Amino acid sequence: MSKSLQAIRGMNDILPEQTPAWRYLESTLVSLLDGYGYKEIRLPIVEYTELFARGIGEGTDVVDKEMYTFLDRNEESLTLRPEGTAGCVRAVLEHGLAGGGQVQKLWYAGPMFRYEKPQKGRYRQFHQVGVEAFNLPGPDVDAELIVLTWRLWKKLGLADAVTLQLNSLGSSEARAAYRDALVAYLQERFDQLDEDSQRRLTTNPLRILDSKNEATQAVLVGAPTLGDYLDEESRLHFEGVKARLDAAGIRYQINHKLVRGLDYYNRTVFEWVTDKLGAQGTVCAGGRYDGLVAQLGGKATPGVGFAMGVERLVLLLETLDLLPAELNRAADVYVCAFGEAAELAALTLTERLRDELPGLRLLLNSGGGSFKSQFKKADKSGARYALILGDDELAGRVVGCKPLRDDSEQQSVAWDALAEHLAACQQA
């Protein structure tokens, strides 16, 4: 007996009963991004491996352990994208979108891929919405991105469920000086570090700061902090970000251990975290990457952005019961018809209603059946009303309009008055 085919572990189907929540989240965010002047860009999910090795950084967990990399038929190394910023920067460079200092505000959405241990809120194929801004070096756009995310949380009802953590990584020179000081401190306490942190001490020591190991965290209590090594320009930039967040009324926590897992960040970094999802608490994260464009072969170009995880945000909305109840309603109106002539008339009426009321979700019964069986399907669809068309209604050129969600009486409505009647019902 052949083995039944299944999805790859950690790569999940998003089923019809789940997609309304995804569409609700994505449409809410896209509406916000439009309002802030960000334009959509669509990017490949496969890039040359070199892009991520140069952009994300050798020695990072993402590049060393987590990428899906393979050789194509030309023996070229390709990788399923593990994140979106590097690919977006590549597109901006390739098409000259930021040439001559022109400002670009872009967003993209789609699947990312990392070989990680699958668990709730962490998958091998996961979906992100990413937002990037180029040629804006000041603290104002850093703050704008954070304010934008804050507005999204308020729209979704999540404002009390998330906390903003904020830090500045300073310039590359300041970060290098801090790196040396941190390494010197930790080398003296090498035996007290967990095995993973011992390895990172030579490959990516800043990542030790967000170790989840309790013994390592105890060692870090007395470690030097990034704030002690900030250059003056970065300090003023960070003060500018904080001043704007204060003016917008957005609360934040300074987290000197917040470094982010990708090498390209400098100056502002931030994360929105929640305590409602256990270990997978980061729902949105980003920061400034002023050196990345040059690192990938372009002219020095300021950049800043963020990405948010769709799966985690949907999970958070579900956990807190914040999804609108009507999301699971397949239709507003279910059209029932019995008899061949009635079915033909129902088709004509339904299509006319689609023209006259384009926002109305109409589900025309398929597969025949008695009125009793059709009413069961109408109820299951979540529709608020059933339209009934049989021989009697056909003869009188009327339609029975039956409320399904309250005790109101069924009404007979003339065909020509049906659109007006349903529009009024929707407003009620």
From Swiss-Prot:
GO MF annotations in UniProt: ATP binding; histidine-tRNA ligase activity
Keyword Calcium: no
Keywords on record: Aminoacyl-tRNA synthetase, ATP-binding, Cytoplasm, Ligase, Nucleotide-binding, Protein biosynthesis
Compartments (UniProt record): Cytoplasm
InterPro entries, per database record: aa-tRNA-synth_II, aa-tRNA-synth_II/BPL/LPL, Anticodon-bd, Anticodon-bd_dom_sf, His-tRNA-ligase, HisRS-like_core, HisRS/HisZ, HisRS_anticodon
EC number(s) per entry: 6.1.1.21
Principal localisation: cytoplasm
Catalytic activity: tRNA(His) + L-histidine + ATP = L-histidyl-tRNA(His) + AMP + diphosphate + H(+)
Domain of life: Bacteria
GO cellular component: cytoplasm
Gene Ontology biological-process annotations: histidyl-tRNA aminoacylation
Protein family according to the UniProt entry: Belongs to the class-II aminoacyl-tRNA synthetase family.
HAMAP family xrefs: His_tRNA_synth
Subunit structure and binding partners: Homodimer.
UniProt-recorded name of the protein: Histidine--tRNA ligase
Organism the protein comes from: Ectopseudomonas mendocina (strain ymp) (Pseudomonas mendocina)
Biological classification of the source: Bacteria, Pseudomonadati, Pseudomonadota, Gammaproteobacteria, Pseudomonadales
